[in-house]
From Swiss-Prot:
Gene Ontology process terms (BP): cell division; cell wall organization; peptidoglycan biosynthetic process; regulation of cell shape
Family membership noted in the UniProt record: Belongs to the MurCDEF family. MurD2 subfamily.
Pathway(s): Cell wall biogenesis; peptidoglycan biosynthesis
Gene Ontology molecular function, alphabetical: ATP binding; tetrahydrofolylpolyglutamate synthase activity; UDP-N-acetylmuramoylalanine-D-glutamate ligase activity
Protein name: UDP-N-acetylmuramoyl-L-alanine--L-glutamate ligase
Chief localisation class: cytoplasm
Residues noted as binding ATP in the record, renumbered to the chain: 122-128
Function: Cell wall formation. Catalyzes the addition of L-glutamate to the nucleotide precursor UDP-N-acetylmuramoyl-L-alanine. Has weak activity with D-glutamate.
Gene designation: murD2
Pfam families: Mur_ligase_M (PF08245)
Stretch forming the signal peptide: none
């Protein structure tokens, strides 16, 4: 559905975050006088009233009855369509649509294709992979948009001039279903990996997997690039797409630090500013994507050396009094924390874990700690006590030191004390969202930097967003 089809209909927007702001501006650009209703939080009402938009009505009660008054509701990604009020309104005939679906519908050719649209998703590594893809496309001389979940909503760049040759689009599991629902087909979709996440939004693991994979099962991209080492992905059957693989001995893969294409050694990635084996494997995904687009991936590979790492993703802030501080605030699953730990396997590490509790299972994390653990673990925040109880038997057996903190500031003090003035690494890789204590993972990362003695404002910008 295109925005022009909203004309004359009862339309509301739900959510006044960055995605909601982008949706409002996109609708107003095409429908300047149409009546719209915005459902927002009470503290956002004043900001909306300051827009002085006489055709905009503001409400704070997004009940099933209120939502059911509208033919179309443009929903922000963070609002789950599985909420009771959304399901009830949908049963009454209300159509819910996301900004991602609108963008794809606006860009679709008559045959449904969206040339140059490259969608990247996965539980871990999708932001860095998308940014690296955009970086190498630009090095190759192509005007490229770096957009989506990475921090630039698609509807904020609906019709840039001149248009980019490629769109490097990061999609979260909140957005992947929008692509299929739009009726459009991306040129290429990359799926990096799948681990349980966002279960509070999706409801259960099976639905998370289904929603995540709807990008390729319902979106029917022209080309799909999958991680051959991920069992869930390896079993997919996608008859409507050309399926390619990375992390496979016959394609682009990693041996030690060396990137191979089949049996041919291409590039030593040891000096690429991508901490962790998982990130260098995702470099293989980027090179495979470039090749799938018809570009010379082998020639472009060395340009990865000039890539600027993203903030809050295994970001080394620096050292104070012999202790290095690493900000991995983006880590919102136990698997992400394990990947972060693997980057510092030979170091004295104090790991800070815990955050908003959305019911993820930490037993695999505990099993890994029984085999290879950091020197110290500090638990904190809402799910900290649950993690602490799970790890306590291992700590009692002498596998590592275990400490319980009230908040991040307390956790950092406990970590510094536990390292005992002998140097080491304080690693913030919470394995959980920041909700409750912070507005988002960026705010958590900034607070960590501030508490460590660094300028929080200097580490927060994602380079290269938008069209360049």
């Amino acid at each position: 559905m295109r925005i022009s089809q909203f004309e004359g209909k009862a339309v509301a927007l739900w959510g006044w975050g960055r995605e909601g702001r982008g949706a409002y501006r996109a609708l107003r650009a095409q429908l300047p006088t149409q009546s719209l209703t915005m459902f927002c939080n009470a503290e956002e009402v004043r900001e909306l009233e300051s827009l002085a938009d006489a055709a905009l009505h503001v409400e704070t009660d997004a009940s099933a009855q209120a939502l059911g008054r509208f033919e179309i509701v443009v929903k922000s990604p963070g609002i789950s369509p599985y909420r009771a009020e959304a399901l009830a309104a949908a049963a009454q005939g209300t159509q819910f649509i996301g900004g991602t679906a609108l963008w794809f519908a606006e860009h679709a050719q008559p045959d449904g294709s969206v040339p140059g649209a490259i969608c990247v998703t996965g539980t871990k590594g999708k932001s860095t992979t998308t940014a690296l893809l955009a970086h190498l496309l630009r090095v190759a001389g192509h005007r490229t948009a770096l957009v989506g979940n990475i921090g630039q909503p698609l509807l904020e760049v609906l019709a840039p001039q001149p248009p980019p040759a490629y769109w490097a689009i990061e999609l979260s599991s909140y957005q992947t279903g929008d692509v299929g629902r739009s009726g459009a087909r991306p040129e290429l979709a990359v799926v990096l990996n799948l681990f349980p996440e966002h279960l509070d939004w999706h409801g259960d693991e099976a639905r998370y997997v289904r929603d995540k994979l709807s990008l390729v099962t319902e979106g029917r991209p022209r080309i799909v690039l999958l991680n051959a080492a991920d069992p869930l992905l390896a079993s997919l059957q996608l008859p409507d797409s050309e399926v390619l693989w990375f992390n496979h001995p016959e394609g682009w893969h990693l041996r030690g630090d060396v990137v191979y294409r089949g049996e041919q050694a291409i590039f030593d990635s040891a000096d690429v500013p991508l901490p962790g084996v998982h990130n260098r494997r995702n470099l293989c995904a980027v090179l495979a994507a470039l090749e799938a687009l018809g570009l010379d991936a082998e020639a472009l590979a060395p340009a990865a050396l000039s890539f600027r790492p993203l903030p809050n993703r295994l970001q080394v802030l620096g050292s104070v009094d012999g202790i290095s501080y690493v900000n991995d605030s983006i880590s919102t699953t136990p698997y992400a924390s394990l990947a972060a730990l693997a980057c510092f396997a030979q170091r004295r590490v104090a790991l800070l874990v815990g955050g908003h509790d959305r019911g993820l299972d930490w037993h695999d994390f505990a099993r890994h700690m029984a085999q290879q653990a950091p020197l110290e673990i500090v638990t904190m925040a809402a799910n900290g006590p649950r993690i602490h109880a799970l790890l306590a038997p291992l700590a009692d057996a002498g596998r590592f030191g275990l400490h319980a903190a009230n908040d991040l500031e307390h956790a950092m003090q406990l970590a510094r004390d536990a390292l005992g003035g002998q140097g080491g690494v304080v690693l913030l890789s919470p394995g959980a969202p920041s909700f409750g204590a912070y507005s988002d993972y960026v705010a958590r990362g900034r607070h960590f930097a501030q508490l460590a003695g660094f300028d929080p404002a200097a580490i927060s910008a994602i380079p290269g967003l938008g069209v360049h």
